[in-house]
């Protein structure tokens, strides 16, 4: 098989897409002989892996592929993969006829079958996940990303993911454990378990086996010798039961950083979003986790200006932010998406200037908290896993609760856990000195 064909991949969107891009790379390397290049002009095949959660990445898709078409060498092919591919399908080729094929987010393993078929569109979502093929490509030597499920069964009214990735199906636990074990044998010391709603894992399998739980999966994965740290994203607040929280708190291998997507602090807005929980439920779960895990970092997603959101609703969101004291917030202004239930609320959509101001107010509130909290870490000694060496001679790594830390060091520290005394901070990272 020829090995001189070159592949260029551009990834838009979430961490699931990053893993999907690794899967694409591995499939095409294994079955079609492609090698990856960072130079688009050298590529024989150009793929853009897309996101459709918000409007901006969709607009960016057509801008990007237009530029790719201008830059590509003669005879090079262009493919579109991911959530926008699932959503728009054939319309992508109609709008951009120079696109050679389209492969949906649930069809990555079929990339090898369509890459040579001009005009191919593969967007079905009825795959059997009991035969799921994990990616063998790795972008980080010391951290592995492993999908534990595909799709989503939630019906959040603002979200397009269920229609692009299909129903939620869990990958069999023995396959996940074996994949993590292989990754550890190849040098990984940390694993990131990925799914749209990881803590609803085990409710449905392709082979109709008995139900399982995410807590049990965490216990099974943590038994793997050589694995030092387990992370996961994203959990759903609705499924954060006491059993899960207690396992999270007591299991020393689980990273003490958790993503809890709030979306809104208003119970009435949460109901309109069909999130399934109330403001009080969210605060109760966050409080219980803070109580059991003193050094816990909590990150979140928040949407402002959802249709019908009043000023009182928005103040409820600010109240939750003040009570929980999130360590990182991914803030978004509501973006209407085609095919979502929230489109029926068009008459309740807020003026753009109101949404923009609320976004500013939220960002400013959180900024003030970080400016107060981060300097308190100066003088602390933190243990980090060193993952990379920067051109300026600094190593970069992460603490157990996923704080990014920089320190002077060498490649001898790569893949090792070291102690760093913090000497300086920003709102998002720390700097220090390696100590014995």
Swiss-Prot record:
Its main location: cytoplasm. Residues 5-120 form the MTTase N-terminal domain. Gene3D superfamilies: Methylthiotransferase, N-terminal domain (3.40.50.12160), tm_1862 like domain (3.80.30.20). InterPro entries: Elp3/MiaA/NifB-like_rSAM, Methylthiotransferase, Methylthiotransferase_CS, Methylthiotransferase_N, Methylthiotransferase_N_sf, MiaB_methiolase, rSAM, rSAM_horseshoe. Binds 2 [4Fe-4S] clusters. One cluster is coordinated with 3 cysteines and an exchangeable S-adenosyl-L-methionine. GO terms for molecular function: 4 iron, 4 sulfur cluster binding; metal ion binding; N6-isopentenyladenosine methylthiotransferase activity. Its cofactor is [4Fe-4S] cluster. [4Fe-4S] cluster 2 binds at residues 152, 156, 159. Monomer. This is tRNA-2-methylthio-N(6)-dimethylallyladenosine synthase. It comes from Aliarcobacter butzleri (strain RM4018) (Arcobacter butzleri).
């Amino acid at each position: 098989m020829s090995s001189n064909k070159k592949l260029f991949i551009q990834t838009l969107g979430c961490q699931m897409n990053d893993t999907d891009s690794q899967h694409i790379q591995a499939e095409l390397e294994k079955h079609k002989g492609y090698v990856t290049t960072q130079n688009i002009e050298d590529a024989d095949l150009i793929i853009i892996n897309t996101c459709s959660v918000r409007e901006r990445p969709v607009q960016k898709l057509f801008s990007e592929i237009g530029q790719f078409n201008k830059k590509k060498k003669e005879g090079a092919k262009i493919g579109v993969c991911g959530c926008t591919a699932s959503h728009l399908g054939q319309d992508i080729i109609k709008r951009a006829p120079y696109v050679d094929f389209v492969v949906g987010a649930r069809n990555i393993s079929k990339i090898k079958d369509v890459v040579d078929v001009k005009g191919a569109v593969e967007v079905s979502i009825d795959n059997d996940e009991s035969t799921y093929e994990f990616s063998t490509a790795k972008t980080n030597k010391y951290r592995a990303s492993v999908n534990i499920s595909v799709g989503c069964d939630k019906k959040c009214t603002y979200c397009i993911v269920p229609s692009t990735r299909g129903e939620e199906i869990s990958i069999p636990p023995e396959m996940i454990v074996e994949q993590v074990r292989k990754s550890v044998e190849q040098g990984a010391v940390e694993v990131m378990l990925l799914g749209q709603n990881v803590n609803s894992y085990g409710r449905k399998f392709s082979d109709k086996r008995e139900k399982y739980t995410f807590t049990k999966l965490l216990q099974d994965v943590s038994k793997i010798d050589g694995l030092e740290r387990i992370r996961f994203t994203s959990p759903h607040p609705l499924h954060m039961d006491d059993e899960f929280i207690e396992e999270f708190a007591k299991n020393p291998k689980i990273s003490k950083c958790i993503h809890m997507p709030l979306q809104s602090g208003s119970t009435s807005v949460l109901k309109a979003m069909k999130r399934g929980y109330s403001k009080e439920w969210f605060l109760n779960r966050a409080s219980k986790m803070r109580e059991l895990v003193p050094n816990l970092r909590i990150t979140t997603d928040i949407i402002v200006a959802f249709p019908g959101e009043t000023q009182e609703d928005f103040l409820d969101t600010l109240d939750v932010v003040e009570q929980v004291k999130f360590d990182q917030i991914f803030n978004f202004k509501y973006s209407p998406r085609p095919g979502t239930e929230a489109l029926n609320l068009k008459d309740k959509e807020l003026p753009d200037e109101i949404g923009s101001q609320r976004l500013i107010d939220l960002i400013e509130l959180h900024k003030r908290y970080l400016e107060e909290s981060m300097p308190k870490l100066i003088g602390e000694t933190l243990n980090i896993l060193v993952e990379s060496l920067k051109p300026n001679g600094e190593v970069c790594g992460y603490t157990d609760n996923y704080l990014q830390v920089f320190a002077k060091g060498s490649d001898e520290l790569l893949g090792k856990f070291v102690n760093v005394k913090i000497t300086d901070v920003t709102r998002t990272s720390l700097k220090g000195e390696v100590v014995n």
